Amino acid sequence: MNIDKDVNYFTRGNASRKDMLKDKKQQYKNKVLTLILYFVILCMFAIITILTINKIGNYPWGSETFGYLYKGNILYDSFINGESFISYDINWYNGTQLLKGSEPIPYYLLALINLLTNDIYVTFSVFITLVFIVGGTGFLLWGYYCNRFKLGLFFGILWFFIPNNLRVLFSEGNLQLVIINALIPYLLLIYYKATRENKFKNYVFLSVIICIISLNSMHIVIMILLALFLLAVFDTIRKTYFGKKFFIVLLSLLGILLSAFWLVPALGEGLLNSNKSEVIQKLTQNSYSLLDSISPVLRFYNVEVYYFGLSFFLVGIFSVLFMNGRRDIKNLSFYGILIFIGTSNVFIKVLKNIPFSEFLIFSKVTSIAIALILVSILLWRNLRKVLIVIICFILLSDSMLTFDLIGHNREFPEGLVYSLDYASEIATQRIGILDLSQYGALPSYYLKYGVKGKSSNQVFGWQWKSANTSENIVMINTALENNYYLVMFDRCIQLGADTLLIKKDLINDFNYLDECANPNGYIKVYEDTNDIIYKYPIEGTFGTTVKFDGIAIGKYAENICYSFPNFTKGDKDYIDDYTVSELSEFKAIFLSGFKYRDKKKAEDMLKEISEKGIRVVVDSNELGDEEFLGISSKKIDLEDNYGEFYFKGERVKIGDFPEDEKIFRCSYLLGGKDDNNNYINVDTRMLEYMKYYNENLVFLGLNIPYFEMITKDDVALEILEEATNMESYILPDRKCVNIQIDFESNRIMVNSENNDVIVPIAALSSFETIEGSYQVFNNLVNLKSKELVIE
């Protein structure tokens, strides 16, 4: 045996292993240095981009941007005062819990940046720069993982310029979604690694990033988890890593649990409360056909149009058709295309029949679809370089066209700001901006932080659904949109708005607007090409006393208040939650979409009230088959119009249904006494729409209150006047009275010479009464003592 030879063999083997380890360390070092170099390049592009964005000015123009900046700025003010949370803000919506039911990360991030900049506009520029760098770094890490640094850098830079990402940032101004879009490359990378590596750290990172996304938007994280779940299901069919992927999706739920410290209280405050019909209606209005969504032309006519990107769609189709080898990589592009299909208007029609469809908004996860397509290109190892160059060129060209259209901030908006300055100068209590949100969130921000030397409280704000006065806001906006100016002015006075700024292009009849303003006490004091300003001539803070002759009870009862301003919407939808004495204070009671806890008690109450000479009208559209006082209703769909219509025994001409409701769903009446005076003829059938239980208790069918509200039909209005025994377009007896309102730390102190004054402060459920007493009236504080202290 040659010992020297064996020793040399093992020596050479050890040396070889050492060289291999040394080479691996050197390769790792080179990769890290390359990553750092490319990160520096990415940061340079981010700086150049923000300078380009601010070339004209540094004022954002997105419809929601200033709402985020407002909350970030007011949270910054709290930091300066040594507090880390906003419990109450008096400026918006007659007082609101500003972060109630809101995810916190966007506002805290803006506030923290503002601690460094002390300028909210510079803060927004820093925010954009960070979004560019964070999102781009995600693709740099993909390049590191795939060992394709140059392509990773290109996609990292491109990610900011994706048409959908630009629209969300600049046009929508949805900073929650902007942050989430920046995190999507990390989410997909960690998810992809977790399915292929049995490393605990991947599961931890995935839970952490889901937690961060949850604290940005709970609605979006639901869609993201659904997207990951469907991807796992799709791969199950293809038999690639299906068991592990399901397990990983389940582990992702831990991320939501990590955010429970904030989200659990927020859920109790309505974080996930969504009106399904409203969401589906909005989705239908803002959805497009698949061809329109990839049309590169439409964005030139409307910068807010949803554009997936023709180039990204074609690249996705290309990779699905021509990628050879690993099927799981091809699946990424295929699944991205499926998400895109989920955004189409055809799919929305199917979606509305699915349970919880209000959460299935695929357009919100468009960036996931695009990221999946980009990742599939990164993982496509045998793709020729010339094809990579062509793909990069068409993606960049498509994206830069959108950037040229919307990728900019603007100059100081002097025209609107002049009107806001004037309104703030003359306002003594609150300003109402009646613009149907067309001015975006800018007025809400500017009236707090923009007017020099003065901060003006407002009736409106931003994200009205979280406001305690949301029902009041909806009624005023509906009145403005449908030209019910009389009730609009009256309800603005009730909310304490002594100054109103109205956007002129929302007004159809300026003479009628003035005619409705005068009896409410408003005087026109300013007008330019865009706005009109009305002022109520009163100094100091004030409340109102009011006497309504009618009360509307139920989910849909408010419809009657537009033509009958003398009706007030009841604060409770259950009839038997009221007392007979409470309801006996009114001359008429209108019920629509009402409820009851005890049917017999409710019936007895209405009989007793009607026997006192008080008119009771029951809108039977939601009554259904269950009899109420012996009367029920049956659904029917009518087309174009009511047909032969008889009122008081005579045939009358009633108007057609609106264009968007040509198929009109309503109900006719069954049971009770035959009337034979108020009916329609349908297919030789006589269908009654008005029945009297007794002289003062009337049942009304055919959805006439709603029909009258949307059409202002004269015959329908006459029927309502007959049924309610009330005259239309009569204001309630309202008077303004001066009161003293003081805010001190977390206390609100009210002093009045009168009791029963409606104070224009939203009655929050979190209020605690320290001194005095109050009740809730139309979501406002109704003073029941001359002094009131709440905190």
Regions found by a protein language model. Give the residues of each.
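Membrane-embedded transmembrane-helix bundle of lipid-linked glycan/lipid transferases
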Residues: 4-411, 415-422, 427, 484-486, ...
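Active-site-proximal, structured, solvent-exposed surfaces of multi-pass membrane proteins
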Residues: 10, 19-28, 554-555, 729-791
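Hydrophobic beta-strand residues in large extracellular and virion-surface proteins
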Residues: 83-90, 191-194, 204-206, 317, ...
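Short, well-structured beta-strand/strand-turn elements
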Residues: 123, 573-576, 771-774
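Extracytoplasmic
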Residues: 137, 391-693, 699-711
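Short, acidic Gly/Pro/Ser/Thr-rich loop/turn segments
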Residues: 343, 348, 541, 705-707, ...
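Hydrophobic, well-ordered secondary-structure elements that form the walls
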Residues: 368, 431, 500, 748, ...
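Non-catalytic C-terminal accessory domains or segments of carbohydrate-active enzymes
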Residues: 539-544, 552-556, 618, 703-752, ...
